[in-house]
Amino acid sequence: MQLPISQYNELLQKKLEKLTALLRPFNAPDIQVFDSPTSHYRMRAEFRIWHEQDDFYHIMFDQATLQRYRVDEFPIASTQINRMMQTLLPLLKQQEVLHKKLFQIDYLSTLSNKIIVSLLYHKTLTEEWESAAKNLKDLLEKQGFNVQIIGRASKQKICFEQDYVDEVLPVNGRNYVYRQVENSFTQPNATVNCKMLEWAIDCTQNSEGDLLELYCGNGNFSIALAQNFRKVLATEIAKPSVAAAQFNIAENKVDNLQIIRMSAEEFTQAMNGVRAFNRLKGIDLKSYECNTIFVDPPRAGLDPDTVKLVQNYDRILYISCNPHTLCDNLVELSKTHRIEKAALFDQFPYTDHMESGVWLIRK
């Protein structure tokens, strides 16, 4: 697999032109552009495993034709994932219990040189598999990998030490530690993620009052942004992400950030006094003066009720993975707010996907 590296700047310019055109109706200022490394930028990857007689190998599917194709190296992924791909398969081939009915391998790597390998099977994992997997982990560690092996099957998950890695991200000269849990969302392009965090910190400098973040994940943004606010209140619904966020808050010595496990809808009910929640015992919502809100919604964008919710805040920091739904939301948001800053983050080079950000101030 070869990447069109010589065309990188041209492709990025086309994305900029497209985003500029989309934001033009909203009187956006000049868009800041944050580029990506041209190869080995993706920190996670998933591959199906194709078995052919006595052989097996990684495959992917062509999005246009749906035809499978063999993948022996993957220059999009980190150098660590590539090295693991080439080291792992020969070791799996040595033990039938490790490769029989293996149908998928997921890799999660970090800038801090740690990696999780998840092996997915169409069979029950036995003590024999556990013994072989422990031996596999030892062999990989002898080859210099800081690795966690996880086995997954129907209603089964086996891990030997931990199901997470601790990433270290350099942001504005400071290192932030983020616990990343296997099978949970993490930003795929770590280098661009650092640039996103730096841009968000820059936008919110000199902020007054408190910050509210909806669906904070492992605290990726709220932990870095806490330095700019008196207090930060963040919501997240997934238990593993909440646990990771709590660890990250302590590890990064952030003392003004509170995570609550509830949905955006539940939070709105609590703020409006519609109903009480046991999860909020000990948290005085009235003590927060949140005049800034941060949102990073899924590709579908914000639903109409959440758009109305965020319009109540003087300042809105909106990170989007879909510029079309961002613009749909801006139709309403631009009635009350103006775009102060706009950015393009090239999280996904060589694709049409665009990550963007807007910093909105009440008119």
Swiss-Prot record:
Reactions listed under catalytic activity: uridine(54) in tRNA + S-adenosyl-L-methionine = 5-methyluridine(54) in tRNA + S-adenosyl-L-homocysteine + H(+); uridine(341) in tmRNA + S-adenosyl-L-methionine = 5-methyluridine(341) in tmRNA + S-adenosyl-L-homocysteine + H(+)
InterPro entries according to UniProt: MeTrfase_TrmA_AS, MeTrfase_TrmA_CS, SAM-dependent_MTases_sf, TrmA_MeTrfase, U5_MeTrfase_fam
Binding positions for S-adenosyl-L-methionine per the UniProt entry: 187, 215, 220, 236, 296
Keywords from the named record: Methyltransferase, S-adenosyl-L-methionine, Transferase, tRNA processing
Domain of life: Bacteria
GO molecular function annotations of the record: rRNA binding; tRNA (uracil(54)-C5)-methyltransferase activity, S-adenosyl methionine-dependent; tRNA binding
A single Gene Ontology CC term: cytosol
UniProt-annotated catalytic positions: 321, 355
Stated family: Belongs to the class I-like SAM-binding methyltransferase superfamily. RNA M5U methyltransferase family. TrmA subfamily.
PANTHER family on file: TRNA/TMRNA (URACIL-C(5))-METHYLTRANSFERASE, TRNA_TMRNA (URACIL-C(5))-METHYLTRANSFERASE
Protein name: tRNA/tmRNA (uracil-C(5))-methyltransferase
Organism (species): Haemophilus influenzae (strain PittEE)
